[in-house]
Amino acid sequence: MPVLHNRISNEELKARMLAETEPRTTVSFYKYFTIEDPKAFRDSLYVQFDKLKVFGRIYVAKEGINAQISVPQNKFEAFKAALFASHPALDQVRLNIALEDDGKSFWVLRLKVRERIVADGLDDESFNPANVGEYLQADRVNQMIDDPDTLFVDMRNHYEYEVGHFENAIEVPSDTFRDQLPMAVEMLQDNKDKNIVMYCTGGIRCEKASAYMLHNGFKNVYHVEGGIIEYARKAKEQGLPLKFVGKNFVFDERMGERISDDVIANCHQCGAPCDTHTNCLNDGCHLLFIQCPSCAAKFEGCCSEICREELKLPREEQRARRAGRENGIKIFNKSKGLLQTTMHIPAPEEDKDSAN
């Protein structure tokens, strides 16, 4: 019977990946379609992808598949053949190829069955996620972005918007997509007569968001086909001016792809122009924040003096201090509230008041 999960430690796998010289391609894809038996589909896909040395993160649910992976370049055609043949709905599915890629994005294959391929918190049985808005390609995006009767709505999280977004795009300030959906409806209630353009990294969130807006009475709803990744690729191929400024945050070791030369964010510690995300090196924190090279050296990769000092303690004492802390913090903390508390960054309302 084939092994259907990884048995090697993360540390060893990451070291192997960093030492690997074989060229890899980072790619993402998603598809909303009905999978009758997600567990069987997951197991079959795992066996095929494991043989091809595919690394990355893939979620499978009854509603479809969502994947961010890296594939050896010499096995890319075999990977496409396996994927396209895995289900009729995935034949010729669009693949978003990374814009900036050193092949070091992932080091292990994690293929999991989930309730949803993107956590939306929705339990309204009358909601039809297949009834989506109109796709927009790069040329239409550029045409509509300057239209006063059109609003661009960013359906990504606060830390993604902070380092890059479409010109004049509206931020829906939240830590999670599930919170953003009802928030977007509320924020845009007085704009139901306008064109609403939703966008996200690769298309999966804005596609579902467009369906949710239509479900809530909005009529003229669009979403950027393939998200920021596909828009930037097509705009460059077609020689179109880029209407996205800054960096596109990505959920792998790279943490970002440069779209334009603009640096629109600031170091969370000193305020210098910077858009480089990192996780605090203290295992008891792992706060996601923006840190410039100078502060990285000063704080030794930590988000605060407290974390820097804790990192110097003996391992056993560090473990004792971590005991009882929230489990989520140990992995990857992206909370805006904690970011503001730890880094002393004012909330948007406070910042606006101080500027007046």
UniProtKB/Swiss-Prot annotation:
EC category: oxidoreductase
InterPro entries from the UniProt entry: Rhodanese-like_dom (IPR001763), Rhodanese-like_dom_sf (IPR036873), Rhodanese_C (IPR022111), TrhO (IPR020936), TRHO_N (IPR040503)
Top-level lineage group: Bacteria
Where is the chain membrane-spanning? none
Is-annotated flag, keyword Aminoacyl-tRNA synthetase?
A: no
Q: What is its EC number?
A: 1.14.-.-
A molecular function (GO) held by this record is: oxidoreductase activity, acting on paired donors, with incorporation or reduction of molecular oxygen
Record-annotated Rhodanese domain positions: 146-240
Give the residues annotated as active site: 200
Q: Which reaction does it catalyse?
A: uridine(34) in tRNA + AH2 + O2 = 5-hydroxyuridine(34) in tRNA + A + H2O
Which keywords fit this entry according to its UniProt record?
A: Oxidoreductase, tRNA processing
Gene Ontology BP annotations: tRNA modification
| Protein's UniProt keywords contain Nuclease | no
To which protein family does this belong? Belongs to the TrhO family.
Q: What does this protein do?
A: Catalyzes oxygen-dependent 5-hydroxyuridine (ho5U) modification at position 34 in tRNAs.
What this protein is called in its record is: tRNA uridine(34) hydroxylase
- Which gene name belongs to this protein? trhO
